[in-house]
């Protein structure tokens, strides 16, 4: 799913597919080819009543994904696919098998403030969420050096509490092309597969 469905890449709107929803479908297709049952939620959570509202989007997204998890309780992994926002001169690109590939970043909410846990944002899956990101980060360092940026930790929850294996993944930034972002889906699907199968 995509809390921020309106996030696009450098070649949008000329390339009408250069957005995170199309990117998510690409990842879903690759995972299906590996034998996974994938539900790709293409709902728009960040554009309501004719206005872009990225802060309220997490509330809307929680309602949406909670409903889906009730409907499909066998879902074990929940991925929120985004693209980052960086300064215009920043290029988040590496090369994998000769292909220019957008760098990815695992983004983890800690449900913590400097004073301790944020009581109104409990996350019983916090350790498992962090372990999931760290497993993929470590695997990527060995198999796809340069693919991942540092794991980003922030104080809120970002709906990662819904499953033990939840991840918010930033794929490139607004300065990347869609082709670069799409190229990152193959190694990302491979990392997910290896972590989930333990192989």
PLM feature spans:
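Active-site-adjacent substrate-binding region
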Residues: 125-152
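Active-site-proximal beta-alpha loop/turn segments in soluble metabolic enzymes
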Residues: 44-51, 116-123, 170-172
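Loop/turn elements at helix/coil->beta-strand transitions in domains of secreted/extracellular proteins
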Residues: 34-37, 73-77, 101-103, 146-147, ...
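Structural recognition of the beta-strand scaffold that forms the well-ordered cores
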Residues: 38-41, 77-80, 105-107, 150, ...
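Active-site-adjacent mobile loop/cap segments within catalytic or ligand-binding domains
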Residues: 146-199
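N-terminal catalytic or cofactor-binding beta/alpha core of small enzyme domains
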Residues: 1-76, 84-90, 186, 196-198
């Amino acid at each position: 799913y995509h809390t921020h469905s309106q996030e696009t890449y450098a070649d949008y709107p000329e390339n009408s597919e250069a957005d995170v929803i199309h990117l998510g479908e690409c990842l879903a297709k690759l995972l299906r080819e590996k034998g996974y049952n994938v539900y790709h939620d293409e709902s728009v959570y960040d554009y309501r009543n004719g206005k872009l509202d990225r802060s309220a989007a997490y509330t809307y997204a929680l309602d949406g994904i909670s409903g889906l998890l009730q409907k499909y309780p066998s879902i074990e992994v929940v991925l929120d696919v985004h693209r980052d926002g960086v300064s215009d001169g920043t290029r988040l690109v590496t090369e994998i098998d000769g292909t220019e590939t957008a760098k990815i970043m695992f983004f983890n909410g800690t449900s913590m403030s400097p004073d301790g846990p944020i009581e109104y944002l409990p996350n019983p899956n916090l350790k498992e969420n962090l372990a999931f990101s760290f497993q993929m980060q470590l695997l990527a360092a060995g198999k796809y050096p340069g693919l991942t940026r540092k794991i980003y930790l922030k104080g809120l929850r970002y709906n990662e509490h819904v499953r033990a294996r939840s991840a918010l993944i930033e794929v490139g930034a607004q300065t990347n092309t869609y082709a670069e972002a799409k190229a990152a889906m193959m190694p990302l699907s491979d990392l997910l597969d290896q972590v989930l199968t333990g192989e």
